[in-house]
Amino acid sequence: MKTSLLVFLGLLAVFLLSLAFLAQAPSPQEIPNPKIVTQGEDVEPHPPKSSFYGKRGVYLTAYAAANSAKLNEILAQSARFGLNAIVIDVKNNEGEVCYLSQVPKARTIGAVRPVLDLAGLVIELHRRGFYVIARQVVFYDPILAKHLGVPTSPWVLPTEAEAVSYNLAIAQEVEGLGVDEIQFDYIRFPDDGPIGPDYSARCQAVESFLSQAKASLSVPISVDVYGRVMWPWNAQKIDPIGQHLEGIARIVDVVSPMLYPSHFVEPELKADPYGTVLRTMRHGKARVEVPLRPYLQAFSMAIPTGMSFPEYILAQIKAAEESGADGYLFWNPRADYSSLWEALNLAQKERGP
């Protein structure tokens, strides 16, 4: 009788856990294609990691990567033009953990949105020759901020121990699913203060997280930083976001400055995609020796009059290459890279056979 009761209680616990997971999972209508690849018997689940140098690729949301038609089109075009990397969200700007995470806190706070079969997707991308970069949004996290009840919501600050341990646990789990690199984004404080005061304490908090990540992971780590972080004044630690180029560069393997000309305040920088990328990269390379792999603007915003969108993208590519960038990545939040393919086609024609 006692044994039967224990069995019944065990089955009841499993049933309740299943209900809890189903309650936090999105409906099928919310997921374009929740499982697009399966693990083949003849494919190694964790192939040898390739070098992080010389990577050129595009960014995809988890939802875009889970759409098999969209993904296959992007992979085909990427291969055609010699791109060799794919960046995919594993934790996005909504605070969603985009695969079937087993991290207890992710499940407890309802952050798990299993859009991707991440392990299977990594295997398929490796099979097709792509280096896989997992993008993890760190301190902009509406779900965690709401759970913690912090006044900085939707941000959690880098000084919040629970936010640090949560994100480290996710990164460690993602590493175990076979990705080649983890890229931390929103690895900063909110941009909510004047430039000028001493923000050394904020810089130290950001670098403390990165040091812990570096110590706990075996894959390369990269960091997305504001484009302005590359400019000389940043060396004084006077930026409220807490990103100090020299400090970050001492820890990580790659820095990815987001060099979108449209996001600069100065009109002359907005109007000159080539000059803006070239000058900003040269400033950064004069300060640090870490590989700089910039994000280039592949979304249509503030395109100068008289310049086509593909020409705008191509100008950035030329500047990145001339400045000595160690590869580059393209950002379009909708994964619409039609103008990028036009730009790369123009580049091929200019170079000739």
Please name every model-derived segment.
Residues L83, V87-L118, F130-A163, V179-C203, ...:
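Aromatic-lined carbohydrate-binding surfaces of glycoside hydrolases
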Residues Y59, Y131-D141, Q183, R202-G242, ...:
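Aromatic-lined carbohydrate-recognition surfaces of secreted/lumenal glycan-active proteins
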Residues V252-H283, V288-P353:
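Substrate-binding cleft of secreted/luminal carbohydrate-active enzymes
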Residues A65-A79, E160-E175, W233-A249, G306-E321:
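Short, acidic/polar
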Residues A25-I74, S78, Q297-F299:
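Boundary/entry segment of secreted carbohydrate-active catalytic domains
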Residues L71-E96, G176-E181, I248-S256, A320-Y328:
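Catalytic domains of carbohydrate-active enzymes, especially glycoside hydrolases
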Residues A64-R80, R107-R128, Q204-S208, R279:
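Aromatic- and glycine-enriched glycan-recognition loops and surfaces
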Residues P47-Y63, G120-I123, A134-L177, L314-Q316:
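Active-site-adjacent "subsite" loops/lids of carbohydrate-active enzymes
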